[in-house]
């Protein structure tokens, strides 16, 4: 039985590896997987990072307000609002000036746009990190890496990082908080200390794509770095609403930055870079009725993530890296290949997780698992225990 499973998984692993190479440093989409493996039934998507409870909330609004009323026809056939109009919509909720808001087709579009500006000539990054930050830099741009230590759980030493920046003198510094792929978090207090020391850096990009899943008190208060943008003129904040709302397919994000940078961008495009469905979801962000329910979904998800992480800690011989995001990075026993576990999860259980094999700076056999609903998380834990037990 085990030998049959191993043979089937080995064959699948080779085919999946080829598909992964075509996808670059990102995971193959669900559609690409279904196309290559027609008989594969993916039951749980624990690869892509979004809040499943928020997904259901947004779908409920879309169903009631767009589908049942036939309003979706206007959303699909009419031009969406332009960037300047949507800036004013977001300003109501963020309490910042409209001219300081840039709305993007997902956070990735914003990252690419920021890193390909002519003035960006030297970028400082921590590794491991989100691959787009070193893939999207402009031609001729130098990238310097600050390696996070595996022995310290890839946590962030602000003092050492400041020394590194002072020595390297980059014009652009990137901070992902919580970090991807390990979920390490830097508190708001420590962030203030860091930014004061790095006041000499022309621009600091703070990517908060996962900040809604972090917390600093028992009330799980929603964290915001808008105050950082107000206090430090060199700071640019990047946010992903796709992850917050659980709507990765819509592609929606925004950034807070100097109005002059936004004016320069809008001179060369980005007039209608958000589609009609994206605009509808964006307008939910400023509605009190939606935000009240979203806050309930956000806290429900955080509580489930805490329970899920505790359950993962109970798996024998697996190391669980501390995380304040909606995902967890696991280090497998050295005798077990991550590729085998990923294939076994997909083939035998229909669970899709992320390999860390292509992540610069990650040591050992590691996988990343996104948190899902309680029922789905229970299935993930059960499947992992079974696979690792059979692999002894």
From Swiss-Prot:
O-phospho-L-serine binds at residues 180, 354, 368. Its EC number is 4.1.1.-. Its cofactor is pyridoxal 5'-phosphate. It is an enzyme of class 4 (lyase). Residues 22-29 are annotated as: Required for catalytic activity. Homodimer. This is L-serine phosphate decarboxylase. It comes from Sulfurospirillum multivorans (strain DM 12446 / JCM 15788 / NBRC 109480).
């Amino acid at each position: 039985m085990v030998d049959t499973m191993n043979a089937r998984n080995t064959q699948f692993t080779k085919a999946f590896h080829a598909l992964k190479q075509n996808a670059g440093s990102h995971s193959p989409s669900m559609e690409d997987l279904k196309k290559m493996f027609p008989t594969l039934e993916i039951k749980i998507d624990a690869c892509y990072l979004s809040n499943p409870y928020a997904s259901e909330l947004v779908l409920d609004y879309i169903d009631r307000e767009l589908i049942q009323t036939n309003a979706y026809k206007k959303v699909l056939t009419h031009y969406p609002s332009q960037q300047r109009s949507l800036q004013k919509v977001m300003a109501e909720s963020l309490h910042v000036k409209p001219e300081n808001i840039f709305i993007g087709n997902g956070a990735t579009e914003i990252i690419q746009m920021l890193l390909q500006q002519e003035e960006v000539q030297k970028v400082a990054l921590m590794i491991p990190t989100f691959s787009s930050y070193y893939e999207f830099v402009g031609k001729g741009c130098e990238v310097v890496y600050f390696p996070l230590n595996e022995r310290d759980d890839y946590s962030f030493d602000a003092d050492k990082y400041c020394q590194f920046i002072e020595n390297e003198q980059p014009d652009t510094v990137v901070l992902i908080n919580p970090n991807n792929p390990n979920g390490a978090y830097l508190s708001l207090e420590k962030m203030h200390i860091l930014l004061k020391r790095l006041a000499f850096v022309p621009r600091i990009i703070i990517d908060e794509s996962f900040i809604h899943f972090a917390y600093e008190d028992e009330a799980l208060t929603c964290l915001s770095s808008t105050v950082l943008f107000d206090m430090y003129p060199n700071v640019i904040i990047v946010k992903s609403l796709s992850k917050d709302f659980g709507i990765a397919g819509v592609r929606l994000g925004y950034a807070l930055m100097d109005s002059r940078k936004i004016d320069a961008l809008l001179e060369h495009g980005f007039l209608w870079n958000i589609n009609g469905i994206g605009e509808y979801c964006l307008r939910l962000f400023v509605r009190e009725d939606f935000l009240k329910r979203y806050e309930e979904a956000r806290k429900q998800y955080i509580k489930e993530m805490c329970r899920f992480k505790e359950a993962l800690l109970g798996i024998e011989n697996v190391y669980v890296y501390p995380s304040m995001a909606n995902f967890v990075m696991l280090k497998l026993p050295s005798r077990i290949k991550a590729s085998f576990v990923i294939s076994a999860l997909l083939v035998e259980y229909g669970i899709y997780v992320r390999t860390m094999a292509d992540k610069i700076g990650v040591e050992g056999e590691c996988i990343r698992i996104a948190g899902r609903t309680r029922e789905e998380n229970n299935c993930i834990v059960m499947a992992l225990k079974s696979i690792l037990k059979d692999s002894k």
